[in-house]
Amino acid sequence: MDNPIRVAVMGCNGRMGKVLLEAITNADGVVVGAALERPGSAVIGLDAGELNGLGKLGVMISDSLDKVRDEFDLIIDFTRPEVTLANLAFALAHQKQMVIGTTGFDDAGKAALKEAGKQIGIVFASNYSVGVNLVFKLLEQAAKVMGDYTDIEIIEGHHRHKVDAPSGTALSMGEVVAKTLGRDLKECAVYGREGITGERDRNTIGFATIRAGDMVGEHTVMFADIGERVEISHKASSRLTFANGAVRAGKWLGQQGAGLYDMQDVLSLK
């Protein structure tokens, strides 16, 4: 590609930011154009590549998108909802595309993303793993065949530092199953159980959450009947799988116009 896509990595010194820098550096057709950290961070002004063991990139870490606005075409953001929404406002004002992996948005935040998609290109996904997005399709098929007569439970586990629960991926899995069955997840979801709960309602979708150690991300959806059960699982062992997927999404987005897309669009799974 003669003109590679220049990427601004938000939270470049965080867990995902570091692997995003690695993924971009190792990929064709994209380059690190800017690297951002929060104001006051001790890493401001350092070379993003040298800081993360990637060699000198010539990209100094900044604390403001506005300061480096001419250095990038695309923002990749795996931060927090309030930070992402502020970055979204900047992207709208300056016509920058975005790949968003932030989870935990409320309804107003999701509405803001949808509205922004009318003006700029956005890929927004709860999970950028190719494997997880294949699981979404498998869940749709399983729900069609077994969903009406089985008990459906979703179990997810992540590292001790994850701040939202259930994970965005687990909720997306629940949405896929609920939509396939003609249900509203807001009405049928059960988040954890305690005490005398009574018998299980067949129409509910249960969620259980584990937060422990350094788990990168594990998800299992169970369709349980009397005498048998089907479990569809995905286990991630490295954040690089998410970073590579986000870079893939960014390269795909470079060929698209305005719109709010997800990884199902990127992978042609719709």
From Swiss-Prot:
Main location: cytoplasm
GO molecular function annotations of the record: 4-hydroxy-tetrahydrodipicolinate reductase; NAD binding; NADP binding; oxidoreductase activity, acting on CH or CH2 groups, NAD or NADP as acceptor
EC number: 1.17.1.8
Binding of NAD(+), residues: 11-16, 37, 101-103, 125-128
Listed GO CC annotations: cytosol
Active-site residues, record numbering mapped to chain: 158, 162
Single GO biological process annotation from the record: diaminopimelate biosynthetic process
Family matches, as InterPro entries: DapB_C, DapB_N, DapB_N_CS, DHDPR_bac, NAD(P)-bd_dom_sf
Catalyzed chemical reaction(s): (S)-2,3,4,5-tetrahydrodipicolinate + NAD(+) + H2O = (2S,4S)-4-hydroxy-2,3,4,5-tetrahydrodipicolinate + NADH + H(+); (S)-2,3,4,5-tetrahydrodipicolinate + NADP(+) + H2O = (2S,4S)-4-hydroxy-2,3,4,5-tetrahydrodipicolinate + NADPH + H(+)
Pathway field: Amino-acid biosynthesis; L-lysine biosynthesis via DAP pathway; (S)-tetrahydrodipicolinate from L-aspartate: step 4/4
Domain of life: Bacteria
Positions that bind (S)-2,3,4,5-tetrahydrodipicolinate: 159, 168-169
Location within or outside the cell: Cytoplasm
Binding, NADP(+): 38
UniProtKB keywords: Amino-acid biosynthesis, Cytoplasm, Diaminopimelate biosynthesis, Lysine biosynthesis, NAD, NADP, Oxidoreductase
NCBIfam families: dapB
Family statement: Belongs to the DapB family.
HAMAP family from the UniProt entry: DapB
Biological role stated in the UniProt entry: Catalyzes the conversion of 4-hydroxy-tetrahydrodipicolinate (HTPA) to tetrahydrodipicolinate.
Name of the protein this chain belongs to: 4-hydroxy-tetrahydrodipicolinate reductase
